[in-house]
Structures are given as C-alpha cells and as structure tokens.
C-alpha cells in the first residue's frame, strides 16, 4: 500500500467531477449533503457521475443510513458501475450478532462492487456502533474497505471524538489485514500535522474542498489542490 494517502473527494453532481479530478482527486464519491453525512443522491445523479468519471478513478456512492428499506431505496444505484457503496450505521442497534443483515446485503452485491464498513467516531451522538467494534467486524468478515467518519456535521471534526493515537491504531490494524481505509470527518488541511502518525489509504473530504468551506457549496479546484499539497 502506498505510504502517501490518496484523496477521496465527494461530489454532489457530475458538474463537480472535472474540478475534483483537476485538483487531484484519486477517488470520486457521490453523496447528497442535504440528506446527511452519507446522504443518498438520486440514481440519475450517481449515473451521470459514473459516466463523467469514465473509469479515470474509482467511484463510490453513499447510500444513506442502513435500515429496513435501505436496499429498496438503493435498488437503481446498485445497477450502476460503482466500485464501492456504503451505508452509515446511525441508529443501528448494538446487539449480539449485529451486522448479519449487512453481510446478507453484501453477498447480494454485483460482482466487482465492494461494501464499505462505516465507523462513526461520534458513535454516541449517532447511536451507532463503536469504531473499535466496526473495525473488529470488518476484519472478521474480510471487508476490503472501511470509512472512519463523523455522523453529525456541525462545527466539530473527527479529532473532537478520537485521539490521533487511537485513530492510528485503528487504521494500522485494518491495513495490516489488507483493508483499505478512508478517514473523513470534516477535517481541514491545517489539521494534518496533528495526524502525522495516521496513514490511511485516503483522506475523505467534502466541505473543506468546497467554495467557502461549506459542504453544501460547490467543489473548488484550488481547495482540492490545497488538500493534495497538504497530504504531500
């Protein structure tokens, strides 16, 4: 795995793809920020992004928070040529045997499409599963990708909920079993010096790559470039 992390940029529309790629994005993600941390975009939007990227980099899609209707709501998305799909676990019951429904869904994914296990660092606010438990689950069931993120998008960032040393331990433990790890959580480029010991496969960004630093803004190529330069 590379020593220098790549950059995952979440776009809202196909119109943002060119600026994201020109700024140096190594993976394009699709989400609708107005619908939450992992807000699901309309399938037509996701399809247009896949078409615009045209195989230049991998493409992932956020599909909302997992629940009884999650697969139905994502039916058309799962027909698209996506490399990764992910559901958040906000409100997910932390009970013995949790995750069996996720494993069932993963088995039904098209060939070549991977499910990303999502760990919310602010798991208490999200009423979700603790990150260490998600990491253990991902290792046990050989998930090929994990996202460490925050659920509630406010003035706080990932570092308000997890210490760099703890984050590094999670990331390194997953990478040792050949799981790709993306780290998000409303981070800003100027916070990277605090994360010197954290080497994920990708830093995942949206708000700090948008004009005005607002996640509901539009992708700004210069801000994407700033991230690439900060990563090194």
Where are the regions that the model predicts?
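Glycine-rich beta-to-alpha transition loops that act as phosphate-gripper elements at the mouths
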Residues: 3, 7-15, 60-71, 119-124, ...
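Glycine-rich, positively charged N-terminal anion/phosphate-binding segment
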Residues: 14, 37-53
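Generic hydrophobic/aromatic pocket-lining and core-packing "Φ" positions
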Residues: 17, 46, 71-75, 135, ...
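N-terminal glycine-rich anion-binding loops that anchor highly charged ligand groups
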Residues: 18-29
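Conserved, mostly hydrophobic/aromatic
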Residues: 20, 146, 195, 227
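Glycine-rich phosphate-binding active-site loops on the catalytic face of alpha/beta enzymes
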Residues: 27-38, 80-95, 145-155, 198-224
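Conserved anion-binding
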Residues: 54-159, 169, 173-177
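Active-site-adjacent loop and "lid" segments of alpha/beta metabolic enzymes
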Residues: 157-162, 189-197
């Amino acid at each position: 795995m590379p020593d220098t992390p790549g950059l995952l940029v979440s776009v809202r529309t196909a119109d943002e793809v060119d600026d994201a790629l020109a700024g140096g994005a190594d993976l394009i993600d699709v989400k609708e920020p107005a619908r939450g941390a992992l807000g699901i975009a309309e399938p037509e939007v996701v399809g247009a992004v896949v078409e615009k990227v045209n195989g230049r980099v991998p493409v992932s899609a956020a599909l909302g928070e997992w629940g009884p209707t999650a697969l139905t709501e994502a039916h058309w998305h799962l027909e698209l040529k996506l490399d990764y799909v992910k559901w958040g676990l906000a409100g997910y019951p932390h009970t013995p045997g949790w995750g069996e429904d996720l494993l069932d869904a993963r088995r039904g994914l098209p060939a070549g499409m991977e499910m990303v296990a999502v760990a919310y660092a602010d798991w208490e606010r999200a009423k979700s599963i603790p990150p260490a438990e998600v990491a253990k689950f991902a290792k046990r069931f050989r998930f090929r990708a994990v996202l460490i993120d925050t659920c509630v998008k406010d003035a706080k960032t990932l570092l308000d909920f997890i210490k760099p040393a703890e984050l590094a331990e999670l990331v390194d433990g997953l990478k040792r079993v050949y799981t790709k790890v993306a780290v998000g959580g409303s981070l800003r480029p100027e916070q990277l010096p605090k994360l010197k010991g954290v080497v994920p496969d990708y830093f995942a960004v949206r708000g700090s790559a948008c004009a005005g630093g607002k996640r509901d803004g539009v992708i700004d190529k210069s801000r994407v470039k700033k991230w690439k330069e900060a990563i090194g």
